UniProtKB/Swiss-Prot annotation:
Protein name: Defensin-like protein 2B
InterPro entries documented for this protein: Defensin_plant, Scorpion_toxin-like, Scorpion_toxin-like_sf
Family matches, as Gene3D superfamilies: Knottin, scorpion toxin-like
GO biological process: defense response to fungus; killing of cells of another organism
Organism encoding this protein: Sinapis alba
Alphabetically ordered keywords of this record: Antimicrobial, Disulfide bond, Fungicide
Disulfide bonds: C4-C52, C16-C37, C22-C46, C26-C48
């Protein structure tokens, strides 16, 4: 199943530096399949992955 990336709507900890925390946020709070930190300049974002 294809997953589509979407910035977390609940991440409020500023720059994302902890993949495990981001993944837990996405799975538990946003009901996504996966989550990880995306590192584009100028800020790191927590990205959640949902079924498309």
């Amino acid at each position: 199943q294809k997953l589509c990336a979407r910035p977390s709507g609940t991440w409020s900890s500023g720059n994302c530096r902890n993949n495990n925390a981001c993944r837990n946020f996405c799975i538990k709070l946003e009901k996504s399949r996966h989550g990880s930190c995306n590192i584009p300049f100028p800020s790191n974002k927590c990205i959640c992955y949902f079924p498309c």
